[in-house]
Regions:
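N-terminal amphipathic alpha-helix/helix-capping segment at the start of soluble metabolic enzymes
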Residues: 1-20
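Catalytic alpha/beta core domains of metabolic enzymes, predominantly
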Residues: 12, 116-250, 254, 259-265
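Hydrophobic faces of well-ordered beta-strands that scaffold small-molecule active sites
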Residues: 17-23, 45-49, 83-85, 104-106, ...
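Active-site mouth loops of central-metabolism enzymes
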Residues: 17-34, 58-60, 82-86, 107-108, ...
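Long, contiguous binding/interaction regions
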Residues: 36, 40, 45, 67-82
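Glycine-rich, proline-tolerant flexible connector loops at the mouths of alpha/beta enzymes
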Residues: 48-67, 230-239, 295-304
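Catalytic beta/alpha-barrel core
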Residues: 64, 80-89, 93, 102-116, ...
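Domain-level signature for soluble enzymes in the chorismate/prephenate branch of the shikimate pathway
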Residues: 260-354
Length: 354
């Protein structure tokens, strides 16, 4: 599928990444201006701050609303930076534009709601402003693309996707699981769409920001949106995932930006080997499916059920152990054989039901 897109034309040093930075929330005028001034001194061109804050539970700081918008306008006037904030309703859009907000982004909870997205799209019709769309809280690429389609069909051509990770009940390392395969697939399907990484919300802890920034660059992301606060330990929201402008500047200075396009004869030879191995894999899978169909015919003739749970568990256990010996994760092997088993069952059901 395709979106009708135009270049973002954002101020940058014409190098990856372009960086959007600022506090999670616009708490006070002093906090906003102090943070913005420090970021501008470090060379940041785009300032971010949450004016309206959707919180998981009531009672937390939900933003200062319209009261904070003049502070954002002041940042723009005094530092020359562009300013950006999150919008979730048509009223937010109207107020943000009234105060000269340069870039709007749409949060994960809003992206997950097609009704809310359509209302925002309708409010943006006829307006030329960059709009960035965060992934929905659940790992649903079609929902993410659908949200961007609604905005694009309203006439917004300057767009980007923000990858902020996906919610999970079991939070071990990350606040939101990165599930990199989803933005990678988004890039494959819409290669001209810029993708921005939000390491603050993926990690949930400031010590994870640096490695997540580097991983995003290694995967070819165009930009970073990072929460930075003049005094992060005293932040009114998400204190643990914010860093000072000095720390952010240090993190950015350590990034290794690799060439996206250059290829050499050596890598072409290796890629040819990959192609040949992929062909071998396809041949082996086809051969395995032929044997599965023969088993399906046997089950039909002997009135056996397709699903043999003990056999399936045996396969997963043995192949997981084999994969570990070969340097592959058990989860990866399980995913592969779950897919193979699903296709085997489908083909056997076709035979039994003929």
């Amino acid at each position: 599928m395709e979106l009708e897109l135009q270049p973002l034309n954002l101020p940058s040093d014409n190098e990856r990444p372009f960086v959007i930075a600022g506090p999670c929330s616009a708490e006070t005028e002093e906090q906003v201006m102090t943070t913005a001034t420090q970021l501008a001194q470090k060379g940041c061109h785009i300032f971010r701050a949450g004016v309206w804050k959707p919180r998981t539970k009531p009672g937390g700081f939900e933003g200062n609303g319209e009261m904070a918008l003049p502070w954002m306008k002041c940042v723009k006037e005094e530092t020359g930076m562009l300013v950006s904030t999150e919008v979730a309703t048509p009223e937010h859009v109207e107020l943000a534009l009234k105060y000269g907000i340069d870039i709007l982004w749409i949060g994960a909870r809003t992206t997950a709601n097609p009704f809310a997205m359509q209302a925002l799209a309708d409010s943006l019709r006829g307006i030329d402003v960059p709009v960035f769309v965060k992934n929905p809280v659940n790992p649903d690429l079609e929902l993410w693309i659908g949200a961007m389609e609604r905005i694009n069909q309203a006439g917004i051509k300057r767009m980007a996707a923000i990858h902020r990770g996906f919610s999970s009940y079991d939070k071990k390392i990350y606040r939101n699981l990165p599930m990199w395969q989803i933005p990678i697939e988004l890039h494959r399907r819409i290669p001209e769409l810029p993708i921005i990484c939000d390491p603050s919300h993926i990690g949930g802890r400031r010590e994870l920001i640096a490695p997540l920034c580097q991983q995003a660059m290694d995967l070819g992301f165009e930009g970073l949106i990072v929460e930075s606060h003049c005094n992060p330990d005293c932040a009114w929201s998400d204190a643990k995932q914010q860093v000072t402008p000095d720390v952010l500047d240090y993190i950015l200075s350590l990034l290794v930006i690799r060439d996206e396009t250059s290829t050499t004869e050596d890598i072409q030879i290796l890629r040819k080997q990959i192609d040949e191995l992929d062909n071998d894999l396809m041949s082996l899978l086809a051969k395995r499916m032929r044997v599965c169909r023969e088993i399906g015919q046997y089950k039909k003739e002997h009135n056996m059920t397709v699903l043999q749970a003990n056999r399936y568990n045996e396969i997963l256990e043995k192949r997981g152990a084999q994969g570990a010996l070969c340097g592959m994760s058990a989860d990866f092997i399980a995913q592969i054989f779950e897919g193979i088993h699903e296709e085997s069952v489908r083909q056997q059901l076709e035979i039994i039901n003929k």
